[in-house]
């Protein structure tokens, strides 16, 4: 009798184990189907630089004093942010160190930062336009930002130390290979974008010709407060 009971108990345990395995497989299959449906049915992110689109990610190196370090734009945004929530707005400034308009705008950029830098994250993307005489370098980017002596700014027509404005105390991002410029369909420099904390383009200077970026930031930030 004991032997028979042992056999029956063993068989019962085996059936129980089989049931648990089958149940686990079934649940896993259901979860897989759900995840696939969510992935297929979820609308893809509308990525671009027009107002209302999610700004393309930026992966490069940034200089904020000291040494260059890895940088990724999406590390600075909150995809879960919604209107009314607290969050960091982002101001992207596209320049070329050989661009005379960018050089002359140095004072305005300092003014924007002095006015909004405590509430808005500033990032300058330093690219190289495909124009004769435009040949920059990481050294020139650093000297443009920090106002170091370097006669290479403004297509070798000006010293970086004489750039209008103060040294810029925010990160400068390397785009000498023009990857970011291509992703952003850069129309020229200077070019500006204001992003809401979730990375959505709230203001595009190309869509608002003649509007001062500082006035735009003031208007949008005031409306979102």
Region spans (language model):
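Structural microenvironment flanking redox-active thiols in thiol-disulfide oxidoreductases
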Residues: 103-163, 176-183
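Conserved beta-strand and immediately adjacent loop positions that scaffold enzyme active sites
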Residues: 57, 91, 191
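Short pre-active-site segment immediately N-terminal to redox-active cysteine/selenocysteine motifs
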Residues: 87-90, 95-98, 129, 188
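A short beta-strand-turn-helix
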Residues: 59-90, 114
């Amino acid at each position: 009798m004991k032997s028979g009971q042992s056999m029956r108990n063993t068989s019962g345990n085996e059936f129980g184990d089989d049931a648990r395995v089958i149940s686990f497989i079934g649940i896993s299959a259901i979860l897989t189907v759900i995840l696939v449906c969510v992935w297929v049915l979820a609308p893809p992110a509308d990525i671009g630089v027009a107002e209302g689109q999610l700004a393309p990610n930026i992966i490069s190196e940034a200089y904020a004093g000291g040494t260059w370090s890895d940088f990724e734009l999406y590390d600075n945004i909150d995809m879960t942010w919604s209107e009314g929530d607290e969050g960091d707005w982002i101001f992207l400034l596209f320049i070329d160190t050989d661009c005379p308009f960018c050089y002359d705008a140095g004072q305005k950029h300092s003014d924007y930062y002095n006015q909004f830098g405590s509430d808005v994250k500033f990032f300058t993307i330093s690219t190289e336009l495909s124009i004769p005489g435009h040949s920059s370098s990481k050294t020139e980017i650093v000297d443009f930002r920090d106002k170091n002596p370097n006669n290479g700014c403004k297509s070798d027509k000006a010293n970086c130390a004489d750039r209008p404005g103060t040294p810029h105390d925010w990160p400068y991002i390397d785009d000498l290979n023009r990857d970011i410029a291509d992703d952003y369909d850069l129309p020229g420099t200077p070019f500006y974008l204001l992003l809401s904390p979730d990375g959505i383009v709230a203001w595009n200077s190309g869509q608002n010709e003649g509007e001062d970026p500082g006035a735009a930031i003031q208007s949008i930030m005031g409306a979102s407060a």
